[in-house]
Amino acid sequence: MRIGLTGGIASGKSLVATYLEKQGIPVVDADKLARQVVEPGEPALAQIVATFGEHVLQDDGTLDRKQLGAIIFGDEQKRKQLNEIVHPAVRQSMKKQADLYEQRGYTRVVLDIPLLYESNLFHMVNQVWLVYVDEATQLRRLIERDGLTETEAKQRIAAQMPLTAKKAQADVLIDNNGTKENTYRQVYDALAKTAHE
């Protein structure tokens, strides 16, 4: 079974992913793969430079994430262009990793995909687990975690699909507004149910 783990920005998805790994469930991290596919020498980086210009590279030839972020956040068309380059490369890597885990005998593999809904990747998973927090908590965590201004944080939240729409399509909802222990209990219960499916 492939479980799609997702959640809004700063919802606590990483907390859940770490807990799942500690339970012996392999987690394939889309964000980690997204960083790997844009390393120097990778085809996706060459496409990004061709699309957005040399100024998105640092002096050492690596991607200047801050520069690229400034270009795409708040510009729907440019963000779409970037996604059309990076997402296919990430999907291919995720599938390859999940296949390897299943070949090794794992019956459950988690695909940690922040933009599962936005990229319509339901076909890659059997179940969708959504980690969520209320908007005020999300905003506070994002400002604290990434050192953003309130305006920048609100822009990043607005760039994602609304939580209410995501909840309607999720198989498992994980409320991360409370304590870590409460979140862990919800994940443990959800795992117990999947053991019989």
UniProtKB/Swiss-Prot annotation:
ATP binds at residues 10-15. It catalyses: 3'-dephospho-CoA + ATP = ADP + CoA + H(+). Pathway: Cofactor biosynthesis; coenzyme A biosynthesis; CoA from (R)-pantothenate: step 5/5. Pfam families: CoaE. One of its GO terms (molecular function) is ATP binding. GO terms for cellular component: cytoplasm. It is found in: Cytoplasm. Its EC number is 2.7.1.24. PANTHER family: BIFUNCTIONAL COENZYME A SYNTHASE-RELATED, DEPHOSPHO-COA KINASE-RELATED. HAMAP family: Dephospho_CoA_kinase (MF_00376). This is Dephospho-CoA kinase. It comes from Shouchella clausii (strain KSM-K16). The lineage of its organism: Bacteria, Bacillati, Bacillota, Bacilli, Bacillales.
